[in-house]
UniProtKB/Swiss-Prot annotation:
GO terms for cellular component: cell envelope Sec protein transport complex; cytosol; plasma membrane. It is found in: Cell inner membrane; Cytoplasm. Its EC number is 7.4.2.8. This is Protein translocase subunit SecA. InterPro entries: Helicase_ATP-bd, P-loop_NTPase, SEC_C_motif, SecA, SecA_CS, SecA_DEAD, SecA_motor_DEAD, SecA_preprotein_X-link_dom. May bind 1 zinc ion per subunit. SUPFAM superfamilies: Helical scaffold and wing domains of SecA (SSF81886), P-loop containing nucleoside triphosphate hydrolases (SSF52540), Pre-protein crosslinking domain of SecA (SSF81767). It is a peripheral membrane protein. One of its GO terms (biological process) is intracellular protein transmembrane transport.
Length: 910
């Protein structure tokens, strides 16, 4: 019934496209007049549009004419005129939606339309893509259109200085990777002045390969971290012990990706730890003093049994490098958290890097939800439309192709074993190679790529391998995968963003010419030769059937399979796609094996035979839908928890910005001093209590620790003194201490010093708070066993932790302000710069680049007081006299000598 109604009325997408075509007619009606304009008149349209916007017009009011102008500029600059379907894609993007356009339909050119239009508002437009190569390529090629129309273009890649980034971000249109944008956002919120920040306020972002960024990478947080204690030796010891465990010592669930020790496994581990003198004889792994070891054992277990080399990670230059499960690319600089990366380093016997503590983090989900207007482009989004709508409030519109798709998607072939499957793949590749038809073989991992490569090598079939190990040649290899007799093996969607042109990509081949060694005439001759060669090969390839895409197994997501299929048949080209499966494939084995095995047994499948059966296809699709649903729930659940931290992050970042903007820090200091003075006095002199109940000794200690005040004992000895009078005197005394500092150092210097102390203290308590939230998050799921909702419990406790953090901030801030002194002799720019460099070397994000340090704040005397603010040295502390300790970090060992952390000893009640 539903299918009949769809045929009569069309789908919602069909109706949307129909409406958009009426908009396109209006743009097309403007084309004749726009074409008559001179180059100068066309450029002046930009000035005209900006004036209209300043006079009250909206972007929608000028959208049709602006699109017509960009189309004409593109025709004049590049000789490329936007097709009507590309104009539809541009309108979809401008209206804050996601446009699904097939591979080869010119998404890069489509982005110029909404980017130009929205840049006219002079608030900045970010075009976001997945790697530095695409950023450089697209900004250079499309930048010529923008420049022709009088707009500036910026390009953000890894390794740029803050000055260069600031200039690029302040361009009208900026091309950047999602990683750089996210990290720059975190770094900006760790700077000490607004002038040091590089990003503009959030406005409009167009995300290329939007499904990759908002879906595939949604669970991957961007993290800036700093080093903590070195436990590399312990990781090595535990790794050796875990290698001795038996299969019966642990249980693993591949569906849920979990692993746990069995009862016998716990006993075995305890025995091994005892023999290695890591724990005391007869003590247990879960005894209080050994609890920290559980973390090391669990991570070593995961490293050895849940993570495979050349599938989940690879080892290059003595480093463990993560492989993106969706693209097959190396995730440069990324490290697994919670000690897992160290466990993998121990497993692979490479140098174990120090663990790091999170200083700032954000997920792409929450970063991109900051934009008032967001849109995206991809070749495959309809299967994820519900998630994109639910989480990001983004509708998906599937744009029709300019040319009819002639590609043939052949039925899957299922075999009993991997060997039989590889034999069938080899036979097909041989057939294609013999007739000259190019083949692209898609695999799910580096390991599978190399298995296929070995099979082809044994059969002497020339081929190229494209995976994370050869990332540098990625774009060139994939661009030439459509040449005559080409055989290319690629991990998943490696090379995404680069079209495969039948016959080869002449522009990229021309770039390989050594221009310096040739005369102009010889160079032109070489160029013409390449163009003629690729044109001839294109004819041969079309005659052979176009690009044949072979999938070696189904991915967990139908969308990834569709992306692989989309490599063939661009712009109406011929082509074929086919998937080869076996019962050994991960998806079949974990999610669909029992049902399908039963069908195969019923049908009596013999060795070497393939089977095509509708029931198997349905089972596979159900398995994929099951996994997609499971992954969606994980991302949705992650977002629910991350929203708690995100709300707190927004508060902290907004407060931080307000502190930086503030012209006078005295008001906050004064109000906080008054609040703490009342709190301390009432703690030791409770309102309405008898005099003999007052704890004057500890009141004196606390006032000295907090405000550097020595309490006048004569005052307390008065019979009629009240807690209000003591509070008033404390506030007045503290204020006089501050005023004396102002007289000694100048009000301006004190203002900047107080502002700096407040910012650094805020950074410190926020860092500790993130650590506390991490620990809370790890164990919160256990509350379900007590019939409590983990999310509600997490929200409640996270709020309590946040309140505690704010109280801690006030106390540490006040203590530091009243105890510090400034050595005026050392206020030198050179000292500040040197100190910055030292501090930078101890900071890194997932790229481990010290230039991204939160201390990379320049050498401005108004904000840089780091080297001249003195604190009490640990050596000068008297263990028996807490008043001599000054400010003590909560995670530092208590100065009293107990061996406990300060927060569990003298700092317990803080």
């Amino acid at each position: 019934m539903f299918s009949i109604l769809k045929k009569i009325f069309g789908t919602a997408n069909d109706r949307t496209i129909k409406k958009l075509f009426s908009d396109i007619a209006k743009i097309n009606s403007l084309e004749p007049a726009i074409q008559k304009l001179s180059d100068e008149e066309l450029k002046n349209k930009t000035v005209e549009f900006k004036k209209k916007l300043k006079n009250g017009a909206t972007l929608d009011d000028i959208a049709y004419e602006a699109f017509a102008v960009v189309r004409e500029a593109s025709r004049r600059v590049y000789g490329m005129r936007h097709f009507d379907v590309q104009l539809i894609g541009g309108l979809v993007l401008h209206r804050g939606m996601i446009t699904e356009m097939r591979t080869g339909e010119g998404k890069t050119l489509v982005a110029t339309l909404p980017a130009y239009l929205n840049a006219l508002a002079e608030k900045g437009v970010y075009v976001v893509t997945v790697n530095d190569y695409l950023v450089s390529r697209d900004s250079a090629s499309m930048g010529k259109i923008y420049n022709f129309l009088g707009l500036s273009v910026g390009c953000i890649v890894a390794g740029m200085t803050d000055e260069a980034k600031r200039e690029a971000y302040n361009s009208d249109i900026t091309y950047a990777t999602n990683n750089e944008l996210g990290f720059d956002y975190l770094r900006d919120n760790m700077k000490y002045s607004l002038q040091e920040r590089v990003l503009r306020p959030f406005n409009f972002a167009i995300i290329d390969e939007v499904d990759s960024i908002l879906i595939d990478e949604a669970r991957t947080p961007l993290v800036i971290s700093g080093p903590v204690n070195d436990n590399s030796e312990l990781y090595g010891k535990v790794d050796k012990l875990v290698r001795m465990l038996n299969v019966s010592d642990f249980e693993k669930d591949e569906k849920l990706k979990t692993i746990n020790l069995t009862e016998s496994g716990i006993s075995h581990v305890e025995s091994l730890l005892s023999q290695a003198d890591i724990i005391k004889p007869n003590s247990g792994l879960y005894d209080f003093e050994n609890l920290s070891l559980v973390h090391y054992v669990n991570q070593a277990l995961r490293a050895h049994n849940m993570f495979m080399i050349d599938v989940d990670y690879l080892v290059r230059d003595g480093k463990v490098m993560i492989i993106d499960e969706f693209t097959g690319r190396v995730m440069e600089g990324r490290r697994y958290s919670e000690g897992l990366h160290q466990a993998l380093e121990a497993k692979e016997n490479v140098k174990i890097q120090n663990e790091n503590q999170t200083l700032a983090s954000i997920t792409f989900q929450n970063y991109f939800r900051n934009y008032p207007k967001l849109s995206g482009m991809t070749g495959t989004a309809m299967t994820e439309a519900p998630e994109l709508k639910d989480i990001y409030n983004l509708d998906v519109v599937a744009v029709p192709t300019h040319n009819k798709v002639t590609r043939r998607d052949l039925d899957d072939e299922i075999y009993g074993s991997k060997k039989e499957k590889y034999d069938a793949i080899l036979k097909l590749i041989k057939d294609c190679y013999d007739r000259g038809q190019p083949v692209l073989v898609g695999t799910v991992s580096i390991e599978k790529s190399e298995e296929i490569s070995n099979v082809l090598n044994k059969n002497k079939i020339p081929h190229k391998v494209l995976n994370a190990k050869f990332h540098e040649q990625e774009a060139f290899i994939i661009a030439q995968a459509g040449r005559f007799k080409a055989v290319t093996i690629a991990t998943n969607m490696a090379g995404r963003g680069t079209d495969i042109m039948l016959g080869g990509n002449p522009e990229m081949l021309i770039e390989q010419i050594d221009r310096k060694s040739l005369t102009n005439a010889a160079y032109k001759e070489k160029v013409n030769e390449i163009k003629a060669q690729t044109a001839e090969e294109k004819k041969q390839v079309i005659a052979a059937g176009g690009l044949f895409v072979i999938g070696t197994e189904r991915h967990e997501s139908r969308r990834i399979d569709n992306q692989l299929r989309g490599r063939s048949g661009r712009q109406g080209d011929p082509g074929n796609t086919k998937f080869f499966l076996s019962l050994d494939d991960d998806l079949m084995r974990i999610f669909a094996s029992e049902r399908i095995s039963g069908v195969l047994r019923t049908l009596g499948l013999k060795d070497g035979e393939a089977i095509h059966h509708p029931m198997i296809s349905r089972s596979l699709e159900k398995a994929q839908q099951k996994v997609e649903g499971h992954n969606y729930e994980i991302r949705k659940n992650l977002l629910r928890f991350d929203d708690v931290m995100n709300d707190q992050r927004k508060i902290i970042y907004e407060q931080r910005t307000e502190i930086i903007k503030s012209k006078d820090s005295y008001d906050f200091l004064s109000s906080t001093t008054e609040e703490l003075a009342k709190k301390i006095v009432l703690t030791f002199m409770p309102a309405g209590s008898y005099r003999e109940d007052w704890d004057i000794e500890n009141l004196s200690v606390e006032l000295h620790r907090t405000f550097a005040i020595k309490l006048d004992q004569n005052l307390i000895s008065k019979n009629d003194v009240t807690e209000e009078e003591v509070t008033k005197i404390v506030i007045q005394t503290a204020d006089s201490i501050y005023k004396s500092k102002e007289e000694a150092y100048s009000p301006d210097l004190m203002h900047n010093a107080v502002k700096y102390i407040l910012l650094t203290t805020l950074d410190q308590v926020w860092k500790d708070h993130l650590h506390s939230l991490d620990h809370l998050r790890q164990g919160i799921s256990l509350r379900a066993y007590a019939q409590k909702d983990p999310l509600s419990e997490y929200k409640r406790e996270a709020f309590n932790l946040f309140e505690h953090m704010l109280n801690n901030l006030k106390e540490l801030f006040i203590q530091t302000v009243y105890h510090f002194h400034i050595d005026l002799k050392h206020i030198q720019k050179e000292d500040i710069s040197l100190e910055n460099k030292k501090l930078q070397n101890n900071m890194h994000e997932s790229r481990e680049d010290p230039a991204f340090s939160k201390y990379n704040a320049g050498s401005n005397l108004e904000t840089d007081l780091r080297p001249v603010i003195s604190r009490i040295n640990p050596e000068d502390r008297d263990p028996k006299n807490p008043t001599s300790w000054g400010k003590v970090s909560r995670n530092e060992l208590c100065p009293c000598g107990s061996g406990k952390k300060y927060k569990y000893c003298h700092g317990l009640n803080e």
